[in-house]
Amino acid sequence: MTSTPFQAGAEFAAALDARDPLAHFRDRFCPPKTKSGEDCIYLCGHSLGLQPKSAGDYIAQELRAWAQLGVEGHFHADNPWMPYHRMLTQLTAKLVGARPAEVVVMNSLTVNLHLMMASFYRPSTARYKILVERGAFPSDRYAVKSQIDFHGLDPASSLLELTPRADEFCMRDEDIEALIDREGESIALILLGGVNYATGQAFDMAGITKAGRRKGCIVGFDLAHAAGNIPLRLHDWGPDFAVWCSYKYLNGGPGCVGGCFVHERHACSPELPRFAGWWGHDEKTRFQMGPEFQAMLGAEGWQLSNPPILALAPLRASMEIFAAAGLEHLRAKSVLLTGYMESLLGQHASSKFSIITPREHERRGAQLSIRLTSHGRSLCDRLAEQGVIGDWREPDTFRVAAVPLYNSYQDVYRFVQRFSNAVK
């Protein structure tokens, strides 16, 4: 938890906003409105980020190119479509702490997860288990179990779960490492979230990778709630792969194209088994339409089809805002915003709610998960009627996230006032 001495009162929130060097970025997004026309208090960037105001213009630009150029837009549009996805490569690499050749923007998260497991989950008689956290996002669990089934194995014996201690909600680092040390020789793949979607816990990805590699395990991460939220250094940490979506903290829009990281020790090995498609074929000979697949070097060699330009355009708009704001500045503000929210909630301590997200800022991002012992989902609905947008996760968790690109300290203050009144 940050040591900044937060004060109560609306004046303090206004003072924090007045000296916030990132405050003006709020004006580059479209906040939902209440029925009376006021901006909502939008604390749901962990579920769907706000629309950048430039997104519509970027989409319209490509629609005009399509109308005016037809197929020639692939080569002669102002932003030619053939290499369009590469406009995002440098920005994406910086965002996740990777080298440009290690990342590609493509598909959706679960599709990319299947592609990665096709290459990296290679079970043997002795090493066949997949380690996941209990409470992982259901799509990950479905994908993992289906891969185990596909290989003719039994999920009951091949799926290994990390669980928190009794009466705790988050995993302890020492328990994760101990399990890997104990079971590692039978684990083929460690697949964990960078940030758990339910609790908001950020995992020690560097430590997990080190422990996994020490035991000979492949290590991968689902960064759906981490990309654009917490600092990442994927190349230096050394996991084998990672996947993420782009519609949460990255503000790419509903169902936006996802991203994929393949560490360079694998990315430049075209002989690595994979599911192939024509867009992953060496671009120098792609249009010769030959019968044999020759993978491109780098993460681009896992591409299947040509990218959807109209879906990439809003992501490009958002990534340019990230570049202008600076990742270090965004993280610094995020730590303060979340610490401020936690501090204000603590001033309204009640047996009716508790924060289950870790208190240490190194172990969380923007999200706070609030466990309710009364009211339940009806509280979330009542707050929505008052212009406060968070979200509910069964059985008892209300999730909120103050996103540094577009949330203010006054947003946080007003939320806590309305929440504390609603929970009484």
Protein language model regions, located:
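Pyridoxal 5′-phosphate
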Residues: 1-424
